[in-house]
Every structure is written in structure tokens, then in C-alpha cells.
From Swiss-Prot:
Primary residence: endoplasmic reticulum
PANTHER family cross-referenced by the UniProt entry: GUIDED ENTRY OF TAIL-ANCHORED PROTEINS FACTOR 1, TAIL-ANCHORED PROTEIN INSERTION RECEPTOR WRB
GO BP field: tail-anchored membrane protein insertion into ER membrane
Family: Belongs to the WRB/GET1 family.
Signal peptide from the UniProt entry: none
UniProt keyword terms in alphabetical order: Coiled coil, Endoplasmic reticulum, Membrane, Transmembrane, Transmembrane helix, Transport
UniProt name for this protein: Protein GET1
GO molecular function ontology, one term from the record: protein-membrane adaptor activity
Annotated localization: Endoplasmic reticulum membrane
Oxidoreductase is among the record's keywords: no
Pfam families found in the cross-reference section: CHD5
Designated gene of the protein: GET1
Species: Malassezia globosa (strain ATCC MYA-4612 / CBS 7966) (Dandruff-associated fungus)
Length: 222
């Protein structure tokens, strides 16, 4: 049984340290909201409020860093213990059992020389002739389970993908047309590196739609 690092991380965060991960998520959310509020506050006009928010942001940032370090260290220790347990369960115990029952057949093949020299391989290492040994049987079962697990991952685990939008055509005042291609990644402006003007968005949201359309038409014509 093979478990990837991402699967182990999901298992550890959601089950083993669920309370700590929930606390970390709430702290990150509070930090994001406080930082947004601080960016909306003018440091010159409302310095006392801005300074208070700044201290709150610094405090939350330090708490988030400490919580991340705590989770990372505990995850490292737990991963070593978990991998040791899985090694004993998947490798050490089957090896001991196969060695102890190496002469005991799992079942016998149909009588006859159907398999030829393969019959000796089925009885490896010390099972009676014409039988399937425990070593071969556990190896085949483990391989089948591994293949089923890989097919299940490919079937149920889907990768994220980018959605391409159709080309947009913009008309100029001279009558010429300009075609541009836009790729939508569904990411916020902070992740794409674009400058986000919150005050502009608030002002535009408060104005009627007709005025907004007229202003956008004037900008496109310019």
C-alpha cells in the first residue's frame, strides 16, 4: 500500500490535527480581513486607527507563523511514526508470515501439466509441487490491489485546469477591429500581480449601471 505525500498531508490535517488546522484557517482569515481593512485606512488621516490595525496585523502574522511551525514539526514526527508503522504492516509482517508458512500451500492447481515449468514458480519457495505458495499468492494480491488503487486515483482525483475564454473583439473609433485572446485562471488580483483599486470598485458599485456603461464606452472609444 503506497500513500503519497499529498494524501498523507490531507489525512494528517483533516483527521489528526483537525482542531489545530481549523484554528490556523480562522487565524489566516482574520489576518486577511484585518490586512484589507488596514489597506483601506489612510495612514495620514486616521493614523491612530491605522497604527492599531498595523499592530493587529503584526501580531496575527507572528501567530500564524508559530502555528505553521508547530504543525510542520508535529507533522514531521508523525510522518516518521506513520511510515514506520506502515513498513511493519506492509513489509515486516508479510515477510515473517511467508517465511513461517513457506511450506503450506494456499491451494492446489488443477491436476495435469498445464502450466509446465511455471508450476515450479507457483510453488516457490518450498510449497508442494502443483500448489500455489503463500509467497506467490501475497505477491499477486498486493500487485492487484496496487493496480486497483492506481485506477481509483485516476478515476476520482481530477487535476485543476485552466479554462480558455473565446477571443474578444473590440471596436475602435476609426472602424478597425482589434482581436485579443484572454485566458481566465479564476485567480484574484493579488495572485496575478495586478493592482487592485478597492476604492474604485466601491465607487463604481454605488453608481447607476447606465452611467457606468457610458463611461466604459467613452474609455473604449478613446
Amino acid at each position: 500500500m503506497y500513500i503519497t505525500n499529498d494524501e498523507f498531508r490531507v489525512f494528517y490535517v483533516r483527521i489528526v490535527r483537525f482542531s489545530a488546522s481549523s484554528k490556523l484557517s480562522s487565524m489566516k482569515k482574520e489576518l486577511f480581513e484585518t490586512r484589507q481593512l488596514m489597506n483601506m485606512t489612510s495612514a495620514q488621516d486616521e493614523f491612530s486607527k491605522w497604527a492599531k490595525l498595523r499592530r493587529r496585523v503584526d501580531k496575527l502574522s507572528s501567530q500564524v507563523d508559530e502555528q505553521n511551525k508547530s504543525l510542520a514539526s508535529s507533522q514531521f514526527v508523525y510522518s516518521i511514526m506513520f511510515k514506520s508503522f506502515m513498513f511493519v504492516l506492509n513489509s515486516a509482517i508479510p515477510f515473517v508470515l511467508n517465511w513461517y508458512y513457506k511450506r503450506v500451500p494456499m491451494f492446489y492447481l488443477p491436476p495435469g501439466d498445464w502450466f509446465g515449468p511455471m508450476g515450479y514458480l507457483f510453488s516457490f519457495p518450498n510449497a508442494p509441487a502443483g500448489a500455489v505458495s503463500s509467497t506467490v499468492w501475497t505477491t499477486v494480491c498486493g500487485r492487484v490491489l496496487a493496480l486497483v488503487g492506481e485506477y481509483a486515483r485516476e478515476l476520482f482525483v481530477k487535476d485543476a485546469y485552466l479554462v480558455a475564454e473565446p477571443p474578444m473583439t473590440t471596436e475602435k473609433s476609426s472602424g478597425d477591429k482589434e482581436t485579443t485572446s484572454k485566458l481566465s485562471t479564476n485567480k484574484p488580483a493579488a495572485m496575478t500581480g495586478e493592482k487592485f483599486d478597492f476604492g474604485k470598485e466601491v465607487k463604481e458599485a454605488d453608481q447607476p449601471q447606465g452611467i457606468l456603461k457610458q463611461r466604459r464606452a467613452n474609455k473604449s472609444s478613446d
